[in-house]
Amino acid sequence: PSLAATLENAGVTDSRPRTLTILVSESDSFKVSIADYLSRTLSGGALTIKVRALPWNDYLTALQNGNFDLYLGEVRLTADWDISPLVRTGGALNYGGYADEQCDTLLDTFLQSESEETARTLYRYLDQSAPIAPIAFRTSSVLTPSGLIDGLTPTASSPFYGLANWAVHFDKG
């Protein structure tokens, strides 16, 4: 359905306008710019989106207390891509209080088997009901043939961390 139809189904009409606020940390000017863009893009008709940029600690407090309509954040997933902290009932990063028993069951099933089928089932379900909307994705990876490099210690922010300590075995590549 269109945005207008979705808003009308939610009771947002010209006679019942709604203002929502996007919470964002003011410490990241890029994220504030994104929030401003989303505000301008999504506002219209009966819907107004405002931006509330807060200092980092106030931002975290507002998230933890649920004092927001929408928020712009960043999550770095663990190596196993477990999204439980975001979408599991009571998850550490589930600031919106999303609770869905079927989602929890699908997460458990996926984490126990990690098959392509359970992943597809989980992601199809989340595509229809997820309380989050990913707007960007980035990965930092180092892929090498087994045994090519000794001493490889990449970090999330620096895939080439400790490069001076690497031993490259060209005969194994």
What is the role of each PLM region?
Residues P1-R40, T121, D171-K172:
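Append "and occasionally in soluble cytosolic enzymes with long acidic Gly/Pro-rich linkers
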Residues D69-E74, P134:
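Paired acidic/hydrophobic, glycine-rich loop segments that form the ligand-binding mouth/hinge
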